[in-house]
Amino acid sequence: MSESTVETRLLDAAAQELAARREAWRRVDVDERIALIDELSRGFARIAARWAESVLELEGLDPERPEAGEEWLVGPYLVLRYLHCLRRALVGVRDTGRPRIPGPITTRPDGQVVARVFPETIWDRLFYPGVAAEVWMHPHVTLDDLPRTQARCYHDLESPGRTCLVLGGGNVSSIGPLDALTKLFLDDRVVLFKLHPVNSFLAPLFEEAMAPLIDRGFLRIVVGGAAEGAHLCRHPLVDEIHVTGAEETYLAIVFGTGEDGARRRAEGRPLIEKPVTGELGNVSPVLVVPGAWSRRDLAYQATNIVSMLVNNAGFNCNAARVIVQHAGWSGRTALLDAIRHRLAATPTRRAYYPGAFERHRMFVEAHPEAERFGDPASDELPWTLIPGVPSDARDEICFEVEAFCGLVAETALEAPDVESYLQRAVAFCNDTLYGSLNVTLVVDRETARHPRLGRAVERAVADLRYGTVCVNHWAALGFALGITPWGAYPGNEPHAPGSGIGVVHNALMFEEVEKAVIRTRFRAFPYPPWFVDHRSAHRLCAELTEFEARPSWARLPRVTWHALRA
């Protein structure tokens, strides 16, 4: 018997075992689910150090260097945090029928319903000072409707159980577990979780941590490549699919590949007749609002923007890809120079993700003026800046293709004043740049508080058609908080999925969301642990993970000590 035949039989067995437990999962009551969450939290706490160390080895990072902190942060910390968000939400479902919304529920002048969802706990206020998050609902949702849009699956007693295939992302190791947990506890699905080949070495650790679900037959974890993924996508016992990847991957799943796939897409004839959701790529903009910035402001925001690029060696769908500036702003050149300085001071990283060298070469061949920074080894790429890309350029690779490596472009828009610039910048982001996943808007406090300019900034926040709009810091916060929905702006279709269809995380279980809006201070304190020059990030992020595993006032001093040594 061939190896592929054995593998196929294992995949079929996993699908059959899950299908047999679909209805049983539907019958698991909320108290049992809370108990499962507690078991999962203990399981992920046990594997946290091994998980972080394994990914650091893949990425070639020294565990004793500050940059190692990011793998604690975007790995076990985020999953433990999300489990706590889910637990609180389920307690709300048990006690009142729906998760408790921690902040006020308001309406915008146009009637759109907005729910303040963060901070939720005392720990949120201590660890994320100055950070506030809202969920903006679909315009048709009213205040009276809102409660009915939460936790619908916990009130639907008629729908049959279903199996969801989760195709995990290969770039951020927490994506797969987070998506699996979303599908289990928010959508009421049993889950067949296939790891991406890049991080399939984590399968034994995830099986250990998620054993409470596996032992009860509600989760199966499998590995394999494209052939195994295709087999599962077409499997008759798989009812729906959620994928993290590129738009091309989504289209291949739904319509197939080659000429036949292109023809099916054009004719609207999908290859598979099952729902496919996904979080796909994005050319993520950083929209800079002109202001009277000091040299310290420029240095801070340069580090802020560079940190959005170099995290995970640039292999993030939410990495900074296009910096948008006002052509007439006196600080434009100074900000670019500060970005250059920070890139030059940042050690290059292993380009571990498949295709990185080819993508980088494609961009620099299109832009020979690209500026390279660092002294990369043979398995590394230089940090790369392409400044001054004409904003009206047609078929511009920097605007239409996600680089997915350590490369960022900059463009400038002509406008007579800040208000006009913001209108142009919003239209440019919405209509020219590929994708609708996330955008960061950087504005200093004085500008934001100016009566006329502040209104223009708020109009920009409202008009940006992105699933996450973050003011002043990396929009990846929307991925990390867990309580906010993460996904593309609604409206994409299977034949043109853009940055994706549907949302994940979304711990408060809203069904009718338009976007998340996150607001932070222009300059944060304490210094953000994801900043590239944080001097104790590896210690701090390990302590944060320990704290998230077992929160207590007794553990707080150790976190504070490392936070203040940034």
Summary of predicted features, one role per range:
Residues 1-150, 196-200, 209-214, 557, ...:
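N-terminal Rossmann-like NAD(P)+-binding subdomain of aldehyde/semialdehyde dehydrogenases
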Residues 35, 378, 422-535:
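C-terminal core of ALDH-fold dehydrogenases
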Residues 37, 187-198, 218, 272-291, ...:
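Short loop-to-beta-strand entry elements in the cores of soluble alpha/beta enzymes
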Residues 130-174, 178, 185:
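Active-site-adjacent "gating/activation" loops or surface patches in catalytic cores
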Residues 142, 163, 175-227:
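PLP-dependent aminotransferase-like
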Residues 163, 212-322, 327, 491-493:
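Conserved NAD(P)+-binding/catalytic subdomain of aldehyde/semialdehyde dehydrogenases
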Residues 197, 206, 536-566:
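Terminal end segments
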Residues 291, 311, 317, 325-437, ...:
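NAD(P)-dependent aldehyde/semialdehyde dehydrogenase
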